[in-house]
Regions:
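Hydrophobic alpha-helical connector segments
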Residues: 59, 63, 77-112, 119, ...
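Short, basic, alpha-helical segments at the C-terminal edge of helix-turn-helix-like DNA-binding modules
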Residues: 65-73, 121
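Helix-turn-helix
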Residues: 2, 17, 25-67
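Hydrophobic/aromatic-rich alpha-helical bundle segments in the mid-to-C-terminal region
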Residues: 144-206
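Amphipathic alpha-helical packing segments from all-alpha helical-bundle domains
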Residues: 121-144, 152-164
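Short, leucine-enriched amphipathic alpha-helices that occur as contiguous helical runs
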Residues: 11, 15-23
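N-terminal intrinsically disordered/low-complexity leader segments
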Residues: 1-13, 201-227
Length: 227
């Protein structure tokens, strides 16, 4: 049982305990083979109440991911708000990289979800929807309104960057995620080039100058379209 020292009291605490238990079990089990009663037993919650609070193991797993995503975004916000003059591009990279850092202890769970998503399209859609939601939060936090059709396309572009980088992240055992950072930076450059070719940014991006590791021609690639 997860709750051996202090049992949860409120329904919110019990739901969180169920989500934690489902997430822990996911590290070693296919999501299809995890029973809600098993999750309830691990969390120390009565079976009927677990059904009322959680509904399904999948819902509990997604709830745990939503909690981790909120934690990641708010920690990135705390880092960024005191960072001074930082480009939108670097803020976005910081937000994405921190999500990878947040999930680094949970690669086993992500691997299980990736396998399950190939068999269950509805799970794949839910995971993608959750990723789009957190990417939108990162963009808005960084100063990109992500508004309108162009904003939606920018969100989807950054989602594609994240998914491509995730393949490297799954194998990146370095403490500073150096390989992940390198791939993320490279993919962002390519995404920005596509964004400009498709006119997804306005021309006013001089305030978002790129950093020293890019040449002058590639500086300030990430503009903001306030449409």
């Amino acid at each position: 049982m997860l709750q051996d020292s202090a049992s949860p009291h409120s329904n919110d605490e019990k739901r969180a305990a169920l989500a934690d238990a489902a997430w822990a079990l996911l590290a070693a089990h296919d999501i299809d083979k995890i029973g809600l009663d098993t999750v309830a037993d691990m969390a120390g919650i009565e079976h009927g109440l677990a059904g009322a609070l959680g509904g399904s193991v999948q819902r509990l797993v997604l709830a745990k991911m939503a909690t981790l995503d909120s934690q990641s975004v708010m920690e990135s916000f705390d880092d960024i708000k005191d960072a001074g003059e930082v480009s939108i591009r670097e803020k976005i990279i910081e937000g994405l990289l921190h999500r990878f850092e947040t999930y680094a202890p949970y690669r086993a769970q992500i691997d299980q979800l990736n396998r399950s998503a190939r068999r269950h399209p509805e799970l794949a859609l839910r995971l993608l929807d959750g990723l789009e939601a957190v990417v939108r939060r990162v963009l808005v936090m960084a100063g990109d309104s992500a508004h309108g059709l162009k904003g939606m396309l920018r969100v989807k572009g950054v989602v594609a960057v994240f998914l491509a980088t995730a393949r490297v992240w799954m194998k990146d055992e370095s403490p500073d995620l150096a390989a992940t950072m390198k791939m993320l930076d490279q993919r962002m450059v390519k995404a920005e080039e596509w964004g400009f070719s498709l006119r997804l940014f306005d021309g006013k991006h001089g305030d978002h100058a790129d950093q020293n590791h890019h040449d002058d021609s590639s500086a300030s690639r990430y503009g903001v379209d306030n449409d």
